[in-house]
Regions:
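Compact beta-sheet-dominated domain cores in extracellular/mature segments
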Residues: 1-404
Length: 404
C-alpha cells in the first residue's frame, strides 16, 4: 500500500510498476498502444512537435548528458521460463527484448523510486491534454462492491458510486444510531442496496428500516447529496458533520503548513499563509520525458520562473525553507538540500545550499506577488496555463474543478 496511490503492483525489489498509455496531445498521440513498445535505448535529440506552437526538429537541451527512455524507465523483462497469466502478458520489442505487459500495456519501473512504496515516477490522478503523456502506476482493482468505484485524488482514494457520485458519512451515525431522518432526507439520499447485494471488505449493509438495507463503510451508513450536481462533486463535505469517504488517505503535509481559503477554493500554504505552488513539466520529445525533478534539465523551469536567470527565478518564486531537523513522517513530503543557482540536489554544508520542502521529491514554492493569505496570483503560470511547463497552486479544494 503506497501513501499517494493506494495499492500498486511492484517488482521483486518492491519498485512500483508503471505503464505509459497512449495519450492525445495537441498535435498527435504519444505513449504506447496496447501490445506495442515505444520506449527504447535511443537518445532522442529533437522535439517531436506534439505540442503547439513548437515545431518538430528543434534540438533538445543538454544533449551531452541526455538519457534515453530506458535509462529513466526500466523495462520489466521476462525471465526464462515465465508464462503469461491473467492480465499479465508478454510483448516483444524491436530490439528483441521480451517484456511484461499488464492489460497489454508494457510495464516499467522508474529510476526516481528509491524505496518500496515510492510513486515518484507518476500518479493515477487524471490529467488533461496540456500535460505530457504521463506514466501511471498500476495496481489491483480496489476492493469495493460493484456499486462503487474509487478515484485517486489529492486526499486519497475517493469512494464514489458507479456513476461517479460522491458518497458521504454523517459523523456519529451507525447502524444502531440513524440520525439522518425527517428533513435531513430532503438533501441526503440513503444509498440503498438491492436484495442480492453482499458486503465486501470495509463495506457492509445495515438495516435502515424493515426491508430497507443501506450501504455502510466501516459501519457508518452511506449517502449521496442532492446539491452535488455532477460527477465527482464534493459539495456535501462543506456541510457540518458530513464527510467524504476515502478507501485510503494521503499523509498530512508537514505541521508548519496551513490551509487557506481563496476565491476559488482552498489551497495549501506556508506558515505565513502564502500559497504553495507545484512545478510540473514534460518535454516535447517523442519519449515525453519529465523535466520537473531536480535531476532533470533545469532550463525549462528557469525559462518560466526567471527568463533563464536563476537569480530572477529566486526573486519571483521562493523555495519554502525547512529547518535542519525538519521531518514530515512520510515519503510524500521530504526536506531536501537544493542548490538554488542550479535547481539540482546538493549536500548539507555546501556553500549556498538550501534545505527546502519537497513534495514527491520536487521542491515547492511561494510567489512574490501573493501579498496576503488566499492570494493565488501565481496559479497557472507557464505554458498552457501551467499544465505543460509551469506552476500551479497546490489545491486542497478547487471549487471550479469539482473539489479535487
Amino acid at each position: 500500500m503506497t501513501e499517494l496511490e493506494g495499492a500498486v503492483f511492484t517488482d521483486e525489489a518492491g519498485h512500483t510498476l508503471y505503464t505509459w498509455p497512449q495519450h492525445l496531445l495537441r498535435n498527435g498521440y504519444s505513449g504506447e498502444q496496447k501490445g506495442r513498445i515505444e520506449c527504447y535505448d535511443i537518445v532522442r535529440t529533437k522535439t517531436a512537435g506534439l505540442m503547439s506552437p513548437y515545431p518538430p526538429g528543434v534540438l533538445l537541451p543538454e544533449l551531452d548528458t541526455r538519457p534515453s527512455c530506458t535509462d529513466l524507465w526500466r523495462p520489466v523483462l521476462v525471465l526464462e521460463g515465465a508464462e503469461p497469466i491473467g492480465k499479465w502478458s508478454i510483448v516483444e520489442g524491436q530490439d528483441g527484448r521480451r517484456q511484461w505487459a499488464y492489460d497489454e500495456q508494457p510495464v516499467y519501473t522508474s529510476h526516481l523510486d528509491q524505496e518500496p512504496g515510492d510513486t515518484t515516477g507518476g500518479t493515477k490522478r487524471r490529467y488533461g491534454g496540456e500535460g505530457a503523456a504521463a506514466r501511471n502506476p498500476i495496481g489491483p482493482p480496489p476492493r469495493v462492491p460493484p456499486a462503487f468505484r474509487v478515484m485517486t485524488t489529492a486526499h486519497g482514494g475517493l469512494v464514489m458510486t458507479r456513476d461517479a457520485r460522491s458518497v458521504y458519512i454523517l459523523n456519529g451515525e451507525s447502524e444502531g444510531q440513524i440520525r439522518c431522518t425527517g428533513d435531513c432526507l430532503d438533501s441526503w439520499q440513503p444509498l440503498t442496496a438491492p436484495a442480492l447485494a453482499r458486503g465486501d471488505g470495509l463495506f457492509s449493509l445495515v438495516e435502515r428500516s424493515p426491508g430497507v438495507r443501506q450501504w455502510a463503510f466501516r459501519g457508518q451508513p452511506l449517502y449521496t447529496y442532492s446539491l452535488d450536481s455532477g460527477e465527482d462533486w464534493m459539495v456535501g463535505s462543506d456541510v457540518s458533520g458530513w464527510s467524504n469517504v476515502y478507501l485510503w488517505e494521503t499523509p498530512e503535509p508537514p505541521e508548519e503548513f496551513t490551509a487557506q481559503d481563496t476565491i476559488a477554493g482552498q489551497v495549501l500554504a506556508d506558515a505565513q499563509g502564502r500559497t504553495i505552488y507545484l512545478y510540473s513539466c514534460g518535454d516535447d520529445s517523442i519519449d515525453q520525458l519529465g523535466c520537473d525533478h531536480p535531476t532533470d534539465p533545469q532550463v525549462y523551469r528557469l525559462a518560466i520562473c526567471g527568463r533563464g536567470d536563476p537569480e530572477v527565478c529566486q526573486e519571483n518564486w521562493h523555495y519554502v525553507p525547512a529547518k535542519d531537523d525538519a521531518e514530515s513522517g512520510s515519503r510524500a513530503w521530504r526536506a531536501v538540500w537544493i542548490d538554488p543557482m542550479t535547481g539540482r540536489f546538493s549536500d548539507a554544508g555546501v556553500e549556498g545550499a538550501m534545505r527546502v520542502w519537497a513534495y514527491r521529491d520536487r521542491p515547492v514554492y511561494t510567489y512574490f506577488l501573493d501579498e496576503k493569505p488566499g492570494d493565488v496570483r501565481g496559479d497557472a503560470t507557464g505554458e498552457w496555463r501551467g499544465g505543460r511547463n509551469g506552476l500551479k497552486a497546490y489545491w486542497i479544494r478547487n471549487a471550479y474543478f469539482r473539489g479535487q
